[in-house]
UniProtKB/Swiss-Prot annotation:
Record function comment: Produces ATP from ADP in the presence of a proton gradient across the membrane.
Name under which the protein is recorded: ATP synthase epsilon chain
Matching NCBIfam families: ATP_synt_epsi
Compartments it resides in: Cellular thylakoid membrane
Subunit structure: F-type ATPases have 2 components, CF(1) - the catalytic core - and CF(0) - the membrane proton channel. CF(1) has five subunits: alpha(3), beta(3), gamma(1), delta(1), epsilon(1). CF(0) has three main subunits: a, b and c.
Keyword Ion transport attached: yes
HAMAP family: ATP_synth_epsil_bac
Gene that this sequence comes from: atpC
Organism for this UniProt entry: Prochlorococcus marinus (strain NATL1A)
Chief location of this protein within or outside the cell: membrane
Length: 135
């Protein structure tokens, strides 16, 4: 028995295939999904979704959204997603360093919108860098 996984962003369908196991980056931590999993809906955090198929793991970088598990079908709706194998790791690393610098420049601004945006940029950059290194 397998799962059917769909990862959808507003501008594209990133993944639509079967999987043996899925690990989701939920807002409460990593969540493993196997065939026969109980039905549920969970919030998705910035992070890397891992997909096991035929003994091989694939990675998908995600920004926030939601996931629904229902009858061995998993649908992930996120603001942005990209397959790890399509991410240039050098560019992802440079963006991660730039995001770290941007956040450090805003560290004394309390909860200002600039600091919050810098933290979101850093979270996205971390997810893309991790996904680029996972494949």
């Amino acid at each position: 028995m397998t799962l059917t996984l769909r990862v959808l962003a507003p501008d594209q369908s990133v993944f639509d295939d079967t999987a043996d196991e899925i690990i989701l980056p939920s807002t409460t931590g990593l969540l493993g999904v196997l065939p026969g999993h109980i039905s549920m809906v969970t919030a998705i955090d910035f992070g890397v979704l891992r997909v096991l198929k035929n003994g091989n793991w694939d990675s998908i970088a995600l920004t926030g959204g939601f996931a629904e598990v229902e009858s061995n079908e998993v649908t992930v709706l996120v603001n942005k997603a990209e397959m790890g194998k399509n991410i240039d790791s050098g560019k992802a690393e440079a963006e991660l360093e730039q995001a770290k610098n941007q956040l450090s420049q805003n560290k004394d601004q309390g909860n200002s919108s600039e600091k919050i945006k810098a933290q979101e940029t850093l979270n996205k950059a971390k997810a893309w860098f991790q996904a680029s290194k996972s494949d």
